[in-house]
From Swiss-Prot:
This is ATPase ASNA1 homolog. Keywords: ATP-binding, Cytoplasm, Endoplasmic reticulum, Hydrolase, Metal-binding, Nucleotide-binding, Transport, Zinc. GO terms for molecular function: ATP binding; ATP hydrolysis activity; metal ion binding. Homodimer.
Length: 336
């Protein structure tokens, strides 16, 4: 019966057309071109959305290199665009990665310094990273971008990032349930640090606010109308293996995934007198492309070319991004 179904469109047009999407993750094995693909997708989304944010959660922070522009932990407009913004965060860096102003309240009584918050959570292993993520999600959500694209770290870190909303929601929930027992201790602790204007209620309110945002984000991440994941791979064994592992883990987490990008492909004509290495490489890729077609027949599989030059700078990304929408045709390229 499957053979009678028309193959799905080999592009990311379906994602650009899906106006309900709020969160798009792009990930895969290291070195497959995730940043180029996520940046290109963000450029295409900027054509049809009011405002787009691309966030790098990879400590390597390659989007600065991709757009040839330095980005920080504060959303910055990308050169050459009116509605595309970029920021780089390192979830592993914890609360130290966040600017001081993210810890400010509307009045003096609600202000909690980063140092105090850091001291209080240092005794809880892993909570620093989780709190950092929670604050970032709270920040991003408050900015009301039409859609957010995550340029993620290699697979292992990505799976941890995806699971964070659930982890944080459970962790903050436990902390809040203990707040009545901890309140006297917390009050004494901040008093010892000379922070008279900070009390347990202030910290509790911070946690309440965070929990509310994270609960909402957790619900959205599991809603295919609002969240999806794009897997990027190359036509090689280890990359395909990582992709299958990633797809299975995402499915377990309840995250929608129905788009795969196969990057760095050689497009050779049969009559083309190519070098022996190119011909061998082409045969290897053909083998794994056949496996991808069998494994992911119900996915949109987009094939991208291996280029002679690197994709760097806004104009270069704009040009390359067209390959996400229109299947690459080597004949058209050679005629230009």
């Amino acid at each position: 019966m499957v053979d009678n179904l028309a193959p799905l469109e080999p592009s990311l047009q379906n994602l650009v057309d899906q106006e309900s999407l709020k969160w798009i993750f792009v990930g895969g094995k290291g070195g497959v071109g995730k940043t180029t693909c996520s940046s290109s997708l963000a450029v295409q989304l900027a054509k049809v959305r009011e405002s787009v944010l691309i966030i790098s959660t990879d400590p390597a922070h390659n989007i600065s290199d991709a757009f040839d522009q330095k980005f920080t932990k504060v959303p910055t407009k990308v050169n050459g665009f009116n509605n595309l913004f970029a920021m780089e965060i390192d979830p592993n860096a914890g609360l130290s990665e966040l600017p001081e102003e993210y810890f400010d309240g509307e009045n003096e009584a609600l202000r909690v310094s980063k140092g105090v918050m850091q001291e209080m959570i240092n005794a809880l292993p892993g909570i620093d990273e989780a709190m950092s993520y929670a604050e970032v999600m709270k920040l991003v959500k408050g900015m009301n971008f039409s859609v957010v694209v995550f340029d993620t770290a290699p697979t292992g870190h990505t799976l941890r990032l995806i699971a964070f909303p659930q982890v944080v929601e459970k962790g903050l929930g436990k902390l809040l349930r203990l707040k009545m027992k901890l309140a006297p201790l917390l009050t004494q602790f901040v008093a010892m640090l000379g922070m008279a204007d900070v009390n347990a209620d202030t910290l509790s309110q911070k946690l309440d606010d965070m929990l509310r945002v994270i609960t909402q984000v957790n619900e959205q991440f599991k809603n295919p109308d609002q969240t999806t994941f794009v897997c990027v791979c190359i036509a090689e064994f280890f990359s395909l293996y990582e992709t299958e592992r990633l797809v299975q883990e995402l499915t377990k987490c309840g995250i929608d995934v129905h788009n795969i990008i196969v990057n760095q492909l050689l497009f050779l004509e049969k009559s083309h007198n190519s070098c022996s290495m190119c011909a061998s490489r082409f045969k290897i890729q053909e083998k794994y492309l056949d496996q991808i077609a069998d494994l992911y027949e119900d996915f949109h599989v987009t094939k991208l070319p291996l280029l002679e030059k690197e994709v760097r700078g806004p104009e270069s990304i704009k040009a390359f991004s067209e390959n996400l929408m229109i299947p690459f045709n080597p004949k058209e390229t050679s005629n230009k």
